[in-house]
Regions:
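ATP-binding/phosphotransfer module of carbohydrate and carboxylate kinases, centering on a glycine-rich
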Residues: 1-67, 77-82, 99-107, 121-131, ...
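Short loop/turn microsegments at loop-to-beta-strand junctions
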Residues: 17, 71-72, 142-143
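A cytosolic small-molecule/anion-sensing beta-strand core signal
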Residues: 23-24, 72, 149-150
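Short hydrophobic alpha-helix segments
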Residues: 31-34, 87, 157
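A charged helix-plus-loop insertion that forms the helical arch/lid used to bind
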Residues: 81-92
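General beta-strand structural signal in soluble alpha/beta enzymes
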Residues: 109-113
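Glycine-rich phosphate-binding loop of actin/hexokinase-like ATP-binding domains
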Residues: 129-187
Length: 317
């Protein structure tokens, strides 16, 4: 009888930490979400809080957990267990995340890029297992990406490949946190949704988003108003879809995928921007590349990268 491993998977993004406890049969025993927090101390405290909540929800003893897998935003060095740089978590520059989380939790910890983890999660328990060649974009505070080629995730030389969020849409465009201008994540992320609402609200004086546009508005507010037919919300999602479609059209020309899968928190609003993505891909991608592509969202939504981080740890222990 084979051992049943218990793994915690964490997806640490610029806004939230998503966590799961899962076993090697792929059964999700608990999941939760906490805010990432500002600064290293706050984030480390919230990582501990996330793990404690998962243990409480699953009624699992701390000693029953075999390892923790972390999917981290940004460029990483898996061998050194380090986040090299993460534009949406500025404090994490050459941050030894594996060493730190092992110290504060007592668990063995394994590190993967968050978007690569999302690909692994979707390949294991999601829609990706139905295709051999596909690409994924994770749409959150920023944009991550990943690709499966002939059934295998491609991660590059040191595990940081597929930074789709930093392909250039407009070289004279919006300033990105990475230091460049015109990156896709400036135009197609949850952060971009808020930016575009604020920059276009004067053109829509009757929009219900106007009273909160100058305060703590989030992409969730925009999504909620889009469901009510708010014209500004619908305009912004259409604009987001246009920019995402321009970027994805280039990726289609490079990868010739069977499927394009959207993940991350913003993907829950995909009904309002996916038609425009498809329109742009059909308009801009080359013949022989754009035909017969399936478009879909991740099966497990926001928790796909956490699932993938757990799977990576499971395969590494």
């Amino acid at each position: 009888m084979r051992k049943l491993f218990m793994i915690i998977g964490l997806d640490i993004g610029g806004t939230n930490i998503k966590g799961v406890i899962i076993n090697n049969d792929g059964t999700i025993l608990a999941k939760t979400s906490v805010t990432t927090g500002a600064g290293i101390d706050a984030t480390e405290n919230n990582i501990c809080h996330c793990i404690e909540t998962l243990l409480e929800l699953s009624h699992i003893n701390k000693k029953e957990v075999d390892a923790v897998g972390i999917g981290s935003a940004g460029a990483i060095d898996k061998q050194k267990g380090m986040v090299i740089t993460s534009p949406n978590i500025p404090a994490w520059k050459h941050y030894p995340i594996v060493q730190r989380v092992e110290k504060i939790t007592g668990y063995t910890v394994f590190l993967e890029n968050d978007a690569n983890a999302a690909v692994v999660g979707e390949l294991w328990l999601g829609n990706g297992k139905n295709y051999k060649n596909w690409i994924m974009l994770t749409l959150g505070t920023g944009i991550g990406g990943g690709a499966v080629i002939n059934g295998m995730p491609y991660t590059g030389n040191n595990g940081s490949a597929m930074e789709f969020g930093h392909i250039t849409i407009d070289y004279n465009g919006l300033q990105c946190k990475c230091g460049r201008k015109g990156c896709l994540e400036c135009y197609g992320s949850a952060t971009a949704v808020v930016h575009f609402v604020k920059s276009h609200c004067t053109s829509y004086p009757d929009s219900s988003l106007n009273p909160i546009a100058q305060h703590t508005m989030t992409a969730r507010h925009v999504y909620d108003e889009a469901k009510k037919g708010d014209p500004l919300a619908l305009y912004v999602f259409n604009l987001i879809g246009t920019y995402l479609g321009i970027g994805i059209a280039d990726l289609v020309n490079i990868f010739n995928p069977e499927a394009v899968i959207l993940g991350g928190g913003l993907s829950s609003a995909s009904q309002y921007f996916l038609p425009q993505i498809i329109h742009q891909v059909q308009k801009l991608s080359l013949e022989g590349m754009k035909e017969n592509i399936r478009y879909m969202t991740t099966k497990h939504g926001d928790y796909t990268a956490a699932i993938g981080a757990a799977k990576y740890a499971l395969e590494t222990i």
